Amino acid sequence: MAAVTTTETASQSRDKGENAWAYKKDVAWYRKDLSEDTIGETRAILQQYSKIPPERVIDHIKKVRDKAWEVYPYGSVGMFGFLTLNMPYMPEYVEILDRLRTGDQKFIDVGCCFGQEIRKLVFDGVPSQNLYGMDLHQGFMDIGYDLFCDKQKLKSTFIAADIFDSSNPAFAKIAGTIDIIHAGSFFHLFSWDDQVKVAKQIINFLKPQSGSMLVGKHAGDTNPGHKSRPGRLGSRYRHNGETWKKMWEQIGEETDTKWEVKVNELADDEYFKDGKQYGDWDSETTRRLQFCVRRL
């Protein structure tokens, strides 16, 4: 059975309060219908790994999604974005599988949501005991067991934690032990300064050796800069390829480390196209940034 480390945070314990409006199902980022195109290759995982009958897959996903919506109404939850896997479409995925299948290397998905990328790795032959997931919301990771029907067989470790809480004892346990980190739809949640803090924490998790790497994908912008967050306080920084590399130059200087940074600016996918109706959340300049940051 999977191990779970729980850390209660202030943001988790607060009630919906000022963000109660976001939990309503008439917002632009809550999609009522679910198409086969959206399910994509996740259907194979749900049918073959989770043993869910084909005719039950759509209803199963929608019920789990609505349960997750009550935990926190992220756009990736409302728009079924969690069904779109990131890592299989990265140039490094074959390398990642080869390294993890040996059983000698460890992986963590930071901001793992339901742990869908972890299930894909297991589906593709990676030993689950060497895989870790981390998310602010314990509820999402619990719901992951409901989505994939695997609480009794998955041996991965899940950690509920605030990435900015460096005093978390769970961080000390994994410090310097991780070979590969995935961060999908994560960095774009924060300001430039907070992204730097996140990166430094990620460096702390990674083995301090050549080849340790971070991969992921997040929203970017052809006009990089801090973007407003409708209905919420603060702003988040959206990168283009150049600013993403510049940030990692800064991180390298401040941590006395060196990194090879590869980044691809990709055209809109369905999720971001639909997101245009969010106003400031997404615009015609929104792009996806797919990246690999490898320690030299």
Curated annotation (Swiss-Prot):
S-adenosyl-L-methionine binds at residues 135-136, 162-163. Phomoidrides A and B (also known as CP-225,917 and CP-263,114) are potent inhibitors of Ras farnesyltransferase and squalene synthase. CP-225,917 and CP-263,114 inhibit Ras farnesyl transferase from rat brain with IC(50) values of 6 uM and 20 uoM, respectively. CP-225,917 inhibits squalene synthase with an IC(50) value of 43 uM and CP-263,114 with an IC(50) of 160 uM. Residues 216-235 are annotated as: Disordered. GO terms for molecular function: methyltransferase activity. It is an enzyme of class 2 (transferase). The keyword Signal does not apply. GO terms for biological process: methylation. Residues 226-235 have a biased composition (Basic residues). It catalyses: phomoidride A + S-adenosyl-L-methionine = (-)-phomoidride B + methanol + S-adenosyl-L-homocysteine + H(+). Its EC number is 2.1.3.-. Keywords: Methyltransferase, S-adenosyl-L-methionine, Transferase. InterPro entries: Meroterpenoid_MTases, Methyltransf_25, SAM-dependent_MTases_sf. Pathway: Secondary metabolite biosynthesis. O-methyltransferase; part of the gene cluster that mediates the biosynthesis of the antihypercholesterolemic agents phomoidrides which are dimeric anhydrides. Within the pathway, tstE catalyzes the acetalization reaction that converts phomoidride A to phomoidride B. The pathway begins with the highly reducing polyketide synthase tstA that catalyzes the formation of a C12-fatty acyl-ACP, starting from one acetate and 5 malonate units. The hydrolase tstM is involved in the release of the C12-fatty acyl chain from phiA. Homodimer. This is O-methyltransferase tstE. It comes from Talaromyces stipitatus (strain ATCC 10500 / CBS 375.48 / QM 6759 / NRRL 1006).
